[in-house]
Design a protein with these regions (language model features):
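Charged DNA-binding/catalytic regions of mobile-element recombinases
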Residues: 1-279
């Protein structure tokens, strides 16, 4: 819109020189190289942010741009994100205890602490059960993670937290990955993992069972961190009306987690890319 007052009067009122006004108009019409580059980067950032289902913060978006061969500093990425209001998911502390270790079943020794870091897939798996709230009630999710690549190699969901749930997750992982005998399978001391039926499944596959020490959550920290990502980036962003809704959202997220989500511990590669790179 053109001003209704003489330019000279406006410049004097706002204490701006005529040359400064014209210089600003030129900059707006012809943005310099830095502004042009910011515009290009913003378009790429918004594309990558949408591809992550609006979960990535500046560290992962920074690595995503580098993967596109776009040199840019992390500070610049953070600045541009603030400019347009892009915000990744932030941690939320919530916890419900799912482990029932008050049982008479045998407890396996903690062999994980004695093992060196795995050097290839299917040497060490860790397992745990988590929960998801829906309007219909709890949905329980049993998962198994490969300690080498952080890939979730097996999972199962049910409205019941019982031995068949962890057996289903085990069968999913076993049939998909075909581990050799000697696989170390680590979990907490929950009755589901200590049950005779589940111990039989492991023995039949030649897997060696390991369990955390009593009351020590750090023994299974790798699995806990995976659940934290699921809760923050998927579960807490929804209000599930049904268990079926929750199942669908979780299934989609777990495939994203394995195939596309960048992990800082893997050099910001996804678990699938990390395994493909090292095989």
């Amino acid at each position: 819109m053109k001003p209704n007052y003489p330019l000279q009067l406006l410049c004097e009122t706002f204490e701006v020189s005529r040359s400064g006004y014209y210089a600003q108009q030129t900059r707006l019409r012809c943005p310099g190289p830095r502004r042009q580059r910011d515009a290009e980067l913003l378009e790429l950032l918004q594309t990558e942010f949408a591809a992550s289902d609006r979960t990535y913060g500046s560290p992962r978006l920074h690595r995503a741009l580098h993967a596109r061969q776009e040199p840019v500093s992390r500070k610049r990425v953070a600045r541009l994100m603030r400019r347009v209001g892009l915000r990744g998911c932030s941690p939320v502390r919530r916890r419900v205890i799912t482990t029932d270790s008050r049982h008479e079943q045998p407890i396996a020794p903690n062999l994980l602490a004695e093992r060196s870091r795995p050097i290839r897939p299917n040497q060490v798996w860790v397992a745990d059960i988590t929960y998801v709230s829906t309007a219909e009630g709890w949905l329980y999710l049993a998962g198994i993670k490969d300690l080498y690549s952080r890939a979730l190699v097996g999972w199962a969901m049910s409205e019941h937290i019982d031995t068949p749930l962890v057996q289903a997750a085990w069968r999913h992982a076993r049939d998909h990955r075909r581990p050799q005998a000697g696989l170390l399978f680590h979990s907490d001391r929950g009755v589901q993992y200590a049950s005779a039926a589940f111990r039989h499944d492991l023995e039949a596959a030649g897997a060696v069972q390991s369990m955390s020490r009593r009351g020590n959550c750090y023994d299974n920290a790798m699995m806990e961190s995976g659940w934290a990502s699921l809760k923050i980036e998927c579960v807490y962003r929804h209000r599930f009306r049904t268990r079926a809704e929750a199942r669908a959202a979780i299934f989609t997220y777990l495939h994203f987690y394995n195939r596309r989500r960048r992990h800082s511990a893997l050099g910001y590669l996804s678990p699938v890319d990390f395994e493909n790179q090292t095989n």
